[in-house]
Amino acid sequence: MAQQETAGGVLLIAASILALIFANSYLSGFYNGVLNLPLVVAIGAFEISKPLLLWVNDGLMALFFLMVGLEVKREVLEGHLSQPSQVVLPGLAALAGVAFPAIIYASFNWQDPTALRGWAIPSATDIAFALGVFSLFGRHLPVSLKLFLLSVAIFDDIAAIVIIALFYSHELSTLSLLVAGIGIVMLFVLNRLKIRHVSPFMFVGLVVWAAVLKSGVHATLAGFVIAWFIPLKHKNIHDEPMLLSLEHALQPWVAYFILPFFAFVNAGVHLGGIGLDTLTAPVTLGIIVGLFVGKQLGIFSVCWLSIKLRIAKLPEGATWRELYGVCLLAGIGFTMSLFIGSLAFEGANSEMVASVKLGVLFGSLLSAICGALILTNSRKIK
């Protein structure tokens, strides 16, 4: 698992660098042409027509959220989030880690209603990237810190799901929502019947995803909802727990293909026309400061206060310095921040999109470098 996290993190970095190379070379025309390549799926009168970029953001990312949902369900029902005492510190930390960056972003953009739509961009944490950096530079650290980072990221993902549902959905289609609701009821029935094949769940899940896509609610939410109806303990035809089997099957696809591909199609920003105005734009600065300062400030201050008030305990075997390094890693928003940015500024002008991408790249990079330095040097200070 640690090897997969490390390799996945390296692939994310490589995909992002490749995207920047494509976007800033003679290949930029080809790159943009591929992103805007129209793809159509039609069955009778039902049709989904989207460019490749949106198939990745709406389709492949739904599989990512399916895996997140499976992980959350397992951890909440029988993992290290099943005990209330284990939930307090990461739960409070994640709440502050969402609120502080959002407030900082809003303070930079409060005079621009359009820019304010991006308030949630610096509130996200890229769980794959953060764990990848931790696996590279925190191998000597106690496992409790990794569990803390994972727990914070899980709560962060739940917050992202709620934010997307409440603030980044469009006009709703009653008929599509009804179809999605019927599909969810069918998933519940399949769960209660203890069906041992995963294929019926996936077929109904595909219908739910398509209905949610057409409903105006963001389609990625379907993946998270579907996950909660996959049986936790019922065994499949291979005599393995169905949820765990599906989670393990999805993990390499997410780590080695979905997230790197998402990074490749979303991280490419043309740097040629970018000047000081773009770098110092309120949107860019709000995201950079939100990710790099807001995340670490929110999470670490709430952890310090909770531990000093004896509401929670410092992760077992960890020092304050090591905890601070992990708090820095939570500022790696990368793919999740880019994803929320694509929702917040869908159809926006190229300057706004460039500001979002630059802010996310710089904020995430600062958090990753500083977090890695703190974690690496912590072994020398002990």
UniProtKB/Swiss-Prot annotation:
<protein>
    <recommendedName>
        <fullName>Na(+)/H(+) antiporter NhaA 2</fullName>
    </recommendedName>
</protein>
<feature type="transmembrane region" description="Helical">
    <location>
        <begin position="206"/>
        <end position="226"/>
    </location>
</feature>
<feature type="transmembrane region" description="Helical">
    <location>
        <begin position="170"/>
        <end position="190"/>
    </location>
</feature>
<feature type="transmembrane region" description="Helical">
    <location>
        <begin position="147"/>
        <end position="167"/>
    </location>
</feature>
<dbReference type="GO" id="GO:0006885">
    <property type="term" value="P:regulation of pH"/>
</dbReference>
<keyword id="KW-0915">Sodium</keyword>
<feature type="transmembrane region" description="Helical">
    <location>
        <begin position="52"/>
        <end position="72"/>
    </location>
</feature>
<feature type="transmembrane region" description="Helical">
    <location>
        <begin position="118"/>
        <end position="138"/>
    </location>
</feature>
<feature type="transmembrane region" description="Helical">
    <location>
        <begin position="88"/>
        <end position="108"/>
    </location>
</feature>
<dbReference type="GO" id="GO:0005886">
    <property type="term" value="C:plasma membrane"/>
</dbReference>
<keyword id="KW-0739">Sodium transport</keyword>
<comment type="function">
    <text>Na(+)/H(+) antiporter that extrudes sodium in exchange for external protons.</text>
</comment>
<dbReference type="InterPro" id="IPR004670">
    <property type="entry name" value="NhaA"/>
</dbReference>
<dbReference type="GO" id="GO:0015385">
    <property type="term" value="F:sodium:proton antiporter activity"/>
</dbReference>
<keyword id="KW-1003">Cell membrane</keyword>
<feature type="transmembrane region" description="Helical">
    <location>
        <begin position="285"/>
        <end position="305"/>
    </location>
</feature>
<keyword id="KW-0997">Cell inner membrane</keyword>
<keyword id="KW-0812">Transmembrane</keyword>
<feature type="transmembrane region" description="Helical">
    <location>
        <begin position="356"/>
        <end position="376"/>
    </location>
</feature>
<feature type="transmembrane region" description="Helical">
    <location>
        <begin position="325"/>
        <end position="345"/>
    </location>
</feature>
<comment type="similarity">
    <text>Belongs to the NhaA Na(+)/H(+) (TC 2.A.33) antiporter family.</text>
</comment>
<feature type="transmembrane region" description="Helical">
    <location>
        <begin position="7"/>
        <end position="27"/>
    </location>
</feature>
<keyword id="KW-0406">Ion transport</keyword>
<dbReference type="InterPro" id="IPR023171">
    <property type="entry name" value="Na/H_antiporter_dom_sf"/>
</dbReference>
<keyword id="KW-1133">Transmembrane helix</keyword>
<keyword id="KW-0472">Membrane</keyword>
<feature type="transmembrane region" description="Helical">
    <location>
        <begin position="254"/>
        <end position="274"/>
    </location>
</feature>
<dbReference type="Pfam" id="PF06965">
    <property type="entry name" value="Na_H_antiport_1"/>
</dbReference>
<keyword id="KW-0813">Transport</keyword>
<feature type="transmembrane region" description="Helical">
    <location>
        <begin position="28"/>
        <end position="48"/>
    </location>
</feature>
<keyword id="KW-0050">Antiport</keyword>
